[in-house]
């Protein structure tokens, strides 16, 4: 979906385009409209948080502006604003190497929010956070998607978080879709089938993934 790899079969369409039918330049322009939220954000250890957040706009800035931003952050108020939404405003000028895993994940989310994309693809975005913080962060992401007409697709291990925050749940196992239902339609039987031969008691943040897309424009 991020148009990083061509599909081995079939077609992928995102934002009305089939990425691998576009030219390289057109595909790069498409990628600027998509934000990736990584489980382990690829942030240089010595890079300051403010620079990491502002990097969300690198795909939209020219080379000169991007290089200048490395020397002197160009939008400190903008970075501070998104960090404050994630309770990280006090880390604005802290090197990334001084942050915990959960804090790094929130910096990655702040960068995606600052990018202001049309689509956000999140891979285990809250796996390093405690339950309260994970719940708060997913609520913030979903609210942002609703208010800004952004499509949010998240891959989550935590079934209870997926059911609590996303209206549509896709259960995937061994590369196959087992069900595609609204959250209210997902039953214990569906989960038992999805997790056959695996222990499923009280869901925790270490369970097998469920994919939960949020598409407010549909």
How should each PLM-predicted stretch be described?
Residues 156-157:
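H-loop/switch region of ABC-family ATPase nucleotide-binding domains
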Residues 66-90:
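Conserved ABC ATPase "signature" region
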Residues 120-123:
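Catalytic Walker B motif of ABC-type/P-loop ATPase nucleotide-binding domains
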Residues 10-18, 30:
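Conserved ABC transporter NBD signature motif
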Residues 116:
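Conserved catalytic motifs of ABC-family nucleotide-binding domains
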Residues 2:
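Helix-to-loop junction immediately C-terminal to a conserved catalytic motif
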Residues 95-99, 103:
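Conserved ABC ATPase signature
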